[in-house]
Amino acid sequence: MKTAIFTVVLALAVFAVLSFGWEANGKALSEEFTELIHEKEAASETEARECRYFWGECHDHMPCCDWLVCRYKWPITYNICVWNRTFPEK
């Protein structure tokens, strides 16, 4: 009887140690993941867009990219950048 109780207590202790290790590992992974996301957001914010992309609003002071042209499209009340049927050269 004492051996069975000792085995159960020992098994519970092992499970407690293992679950604590998994929880700590999970927290570390989530912290690394959030840091990676913040780094990606910061990198994308530093890139300045010099031209407007497809369906972006355009004016004289906001030009479209090279492969797009600024046009007025009927249901929309402002000019948008549309494809000029060319491809950008790489």
UniProtKB/Swiss-Prot annotation:
Q: Which Pfam families match?
A: Toxin_12
Give the UniProt family note: Belongs to the neurotoxin 10 (Hwtx-1) family. 13 (Hntx-13) subfamily.
* Tissues where this protein is expressed: Expressed by the venom gland.
- Organism the protein comes from: Cyriopagopus hainanus
Q: What is this protein called?
A: U7-theraphotoxin-Hhn1a 3
Highest taxon in the source lineage: Eukaryota
> What does it do?
Ion channel inhibitor.
* UniProt signal peptide: 1-26
Q: Domain notes, please?
A: The presence of a 'disulfide through disulfide knot' structurally defines this protein as a knottin.
Localization recorded for this chain is: Secreted
| Propeptide segments, given as residue ranges | 27-50
For this UniProt record, the keywords arranged alphabetically read as follows:
Disulfide bond, Ion channel impairing toxin, Knottin, Secreted, Signal, Toxin
Q: Name one GO molecular function term.
A: toxin activity
> Coiled-coil ranges per the record?
none
Q: List the disulfide bonds.
A: C51-C65, C58-C70, C64-C81
Q: Which InterPro entries match?
A: Huwentoxin-1
User: What do the Gene Ontology cellular component annotations say?
Assistant: extracellular region
Q: What is its main location?
A: secreted
